[in-house]
A protein has these predicted regions:
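Helix-biased detector of long, well-ordered alpha-helical tracts
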Residues: 1-305
Length: 305
C-alpha cells in the first residue's frame, strides 16, 4: 500500500480490511557527545516514520554499529533508545550488533494501522493549510557543535526537540489531515517537494511564520552549514520562487537537513486552529501554520513570501 514509488516515509503491507503493518528502518551517527541523549535522538528519529504514516509502533529492533572498546557508551546509547521505545508504547524485541570504528545506532520498527487511516505524503488538497510542528535548524546546529561553536542554551533546546516523539494525539488524527510527512534529511523544501509530486498543486510559504531555532544566524555566517543542507539547496532550489529581499541566511534554513525533525501536516483550513491547539497540548509549543496549498499550472511549485 506504500513503498518506494512515492518516496513514502515507511512501507505499508495490508493484512486485511482493518489492519496493515507499517515497516521502517533508520540509523544515524552521533550528533551529540552524550551517548544516552544520542540513543534517545536516534530512536525518536527512527520511530518518527511510523508516526508520519499515522501508525502506532508495535515493536522495535536495535541496529548497532559500535567500537568494541566503548561498551560503556553503548550501554548508555541502548538505555536512551529503550526509553523512547517505551514512551512510544512499543516493545523492544532484540537487535543486532556489528563491530565498527564509527558508532551508529538506530531501529527497525514495525507498526500497525487501519488501511483507511493511512496518511500519505503526497495527497494534499488545494486550500489546505500547512502546519509544521518543530523548529528547523538542527543540522546547522549539529555542525556548529562538531566545531565546538554551539552555545549550551541553543543546544539544550535543540536536544529537547530532537528527543521529542512525533506522536500525534488520537483526536488530532481524527481531523481532516489530507497529507503528512516528517522533515528529515531533505529539509523542509525537499519534503514539501515530495508532497507536491504527481499532482498539479504547489505551496505558498510565509517565511516569517516558519519556526526555527534561535541564534542560527551566527553559525550560518561562520559557515556552519552541513553538506547535506547545501546539497538540498542545489537539488531543490529550482522548484522555488522567492520574494525579493529574503536574506540568504534565512532561506538556507528551509533546506537544512534535519534529524528527528517535525511533522508537516496538510490539513483542511477550518480545522487548522484546532489542530494547533491539540499540538500545543501535546507539547509541540512552537507549532505554526506556515503556508497553504495552492493550484499551479506551470513553473516553480513552491513560493516563498
Amino acid at each position: 500500500m506504500a513503498g518506494f514509488k512515492n518516496y513514502e516515509d515507511a512501507a505499508v503491507y495490508k493484512l486485511n480490511e482493518t489492519q496493515a503493518l507499517v515497516f521502517t528502518l533508520d540509523l544515524i551517527t552521533p550528533l551529540v557527545d552524550d551517548p544516552y541523549i544520542f540513543g534517545q535522538i536516534a530512536a525518536a528519529n527512527a520511530l518518527s516514520d511510523i508516526f508520519a504514516m499515522g501508525g502506532k509502533p508495535l515493536l522495535a529492533l536495535n541496529i548497532v554499529c559500535f567500537p568494541e572498546d566503548r561498551l560503556d557508551d553503548l550501554e548508555l546509547v541502548l538505555k536512551g533508545g529503550a526509553k523512547k521505545i517505551l514512551e512510544a508504547g512499543a516493545i523492544l524485541a532484540g537487535g543486532h550488533t556489528l563491530k565498527d570504528k564509527e558508532p551508529k545506532y538506530g531501529l527497525a520498527v514495525v507498526g500497525l494501522i487501519c488501511p483507511q487511516d493511512i496518511l500519505y505524503n503526497n495527497t494534499p488538497q488545494e486550500g489546505d493549510l500547512l502546519i509544521l510542528t518543530k523548529p528547523l535548524g538542527t543540522g546547522i546546529l549539529s555542525t556548529a557543535l562538531k566545531n565546538e561553536m554551539a552555545e549550551p542554551t541553543t543546544l539544550k533546546k535543540a536536544i529537547f526537540w530532537m528527543t521529542k516523539l512525533n506522536q500525534l494525539p488520537e483526536e488530532l488524527l481524527k481531523l481532516s489531515i489530507h497529507s503528512l510527512t516528517d522533515i528529515t534529511g531533505f529539509g523542509l523544501i525537499g519534503h514539501l517537494s515530495e508532497m507536491l509530486t504527481n499532482n498539479n498543486l504547489g505551496a505558498e510559504l510565509q517565511i516569517n511564520n516558519i519556526p526555527v531555532l534561535k541564534g542560527l544566524d551566527k553559525y550560518i555566517s561562520a559557515g556552519m552549514i552541513p553538506g547535506g543542507t547545501m546539497k538540498n539547496q542545489e537539488n531543490y532550489s529550482c522548484r522555488v520562487e522567492k520574494k525579493p529581499g529574503i536574506p540568504s541566511e534565512q532561506e538556507i534554513i528551509l533546506y537544512d537537513a534535519q534529524t528527528s525533525g517535525g511533522l508537516l501536516l496538510a490539513i483542511k483550513p477550518e480545522q487548522a486552529e484546532k489542530a494547533k491547539t491539540l499540538l500545543y497540548q501535546q507539547g509541540f509549543t512552537l507549532s505554526q501554520i506556515i503556508g497553504k496549498i495552492i493550484k499551479v499550472s506551470a513553473g516553480r511549485k513552491i513560493r516563498i513570501i
